[in-house]
Amino acid sequence: MKKKLVCAYIIGYGIFPEWYSVLTPCKEATETNCYITWASFKRGYVPEQGSLLVGKTCVNPISWTIDTLPASTSGGMLLSVKAKKRFKSTAQIHNNYLWVKTNTPFVQTWNVLHLMDYNLYWMDIRKNVALRVAEYLKKK
């Protein structure tokens, strides 16, 4: 099964590596046969201990790495399908969850950004899916 998996995007939940005996977290943008996970919080916010959103693994949805270097994107969400402006975000892994800073107006007041785990990085996710699928097909 693992060899047939391009990538599992398990977004918004705390994942513990020991849950998957054959899958490991993705460590780079083109890696296949691995999983990606993150839970988003406002930069500087520390979630409650024991939160179901925080696990032992986090992949940065901009750099697609597991290091703690900050990364920036302008491929974030739109407020509507017709909107032309995309909102910018930065993401940095901190204690196995994602610290986020964004200029998205209504999100700036939230601490827990779980509802926005996909939206903040929708263009980054789309590009990454295409990249991983191409890499997977190249290996076949």
Could you tell me what each predicted segment is?
Residues 1-135, 139-140:
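Surface cap/lid and interfacial helix-loop subdomains adjacent to catalytic sites
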